[in-house]
Regions:
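Catalytic active-site module of serine/aspartate enzymes centered on a nucleophile-bearing elbow/loop
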Residues: 220, 225-251
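Short beta-strand/loop motif that positions the catalytic acidic residue
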Residues: 188, 194-196
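Conserved HGGG/HGGXW glycine-rich cap/lid loop of the alpha/beta-hydrolase fold
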Residues: 9-65
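Flexible "cap/lid" loop of the alpha/beta hydrolase fold
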Residues: 105-148
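Acidic catalytic loop of the alpha/beta-hydrolase fold
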Residues: 198-203
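Active-site loop/oxyanion-hole signature of alpha/beta-hydrolase fold enzymes
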Residues: 47, 53-94
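Short alpha-helix in the alpha/beta-hydrolase fold that links the catalytic acid
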Residues: 190, 204-213
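Active-site nucleophile elbow and catalytic-triad environment of alpha/beta-hydrolase enzymes
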Residues: 167-184
């Protein structure tokens, strides 16, 4: 896969398919290009659009973190610095952003800052911190320390330990309890599709209701039964159908 220098770091990226608009996939807090599996290709095929996937700094085969870092503004940094530079260098003017979990929050921050987008498709987005989500992240830390989770993450990330702590340490920082991006939602004026699993261990429908109440564009909510934190894996048919319908309506 090719690499691109963004904000002083070499980031791995991949193109799939062709056609407009361009779909930009923003992975979750422990995600990567490979962890999307074949889902982006399915969306690209169903819509006739090209898809861009990339690994954020510290993820996948992109540059390893130079040193462990914890910042509660890591999603702001991505949305306001790295993502605009990446899209400019790849000459992507008005994308459709498809974000999962932290990636969905990054999409909202990017659009809320006034950057041009055609629409936002959000899976399991976070706009504020819920106590049940913190408990789940604490549980994942225990799993990382006591199970083979580091080895499993190592299949996808050059330095799984630093990747894990980039995400986990930030979310468990006491300051992160006050993290909230609801103030940016009023500046989101494009169509939004927000998808949430009933059994998501990191967030509830309260996240989606907050988005719908605050954004200025149209906002469709999709609540899926039998679905956890990864709707595209737990309910792939329903999610693919909803995404394809949403994206075709934007054309």
């Amino acid at each position: 896969m090719p690499f691109l220098d963004v904000a002083g770091h070499s980031l791995e990226y991949e193109w799939i398919g062709g056609g407009e608009p361009t779909l930009v996939f923003l992975h979750e807090g422990l995600g990567s290009i490979r962890q999307w599996r074949d889902f982006p290709a399915q969306v690209a095929a169903a819509t006739g659009c090209r898809a861009l996937l990339y690994n954020r700094y510290g993820y996948g085969n992109s540059d390893v973190l130079a040193a462990p870092r914890v910042t509660v503004r890591f999603m702001h940094d991505e949305a306001l610095v790295a993502l605009p530079e990446l899209l400019a260098k790849l000459e992507i003017d008005v994308p459709v952003l498809i974000g999962h979990s932290d990636g969905a929050s990054i999409a909202l921050l990017y659009a809320g800052a006034g950057h041009p987008v055609r629409g936002l498709a959000l899976m399991a987005p976070h706009v504020f911190v819920e106590e049940m989500g913190i408990r789940s992240i604490e549980r994942v830390r225990r799993e990382f320390e006591t199970t083979d989770l580091p080895q499993r993450l190592g299949r996808y990330h050059r330095d799984a330990r630093r990747t894990f702590h980039l995400w986990n340490d930030a979310w468990l920082d006491p300051q992160f309890r006050h993290w909230n991006i609801e103030e940016c939602l009023a500046s989101v004026c494009v169509p939004v599709l927000a998808i949430q699993g009933v059994d998501d261990e990191y967030g509830t429908m309260a996240q989606l209701r907050s988005i719908r109440e605050r954004v200025k564009g149209s906002c469709e909510l999709l609540e899926l039964a039998g679905c956890g934190h990864s709707p595209h894996r737990d309910q792939p048919v329903a999610v693919l159908e909803a995404l394809a319908r949403f994206i075709r309506a934007l054309a």
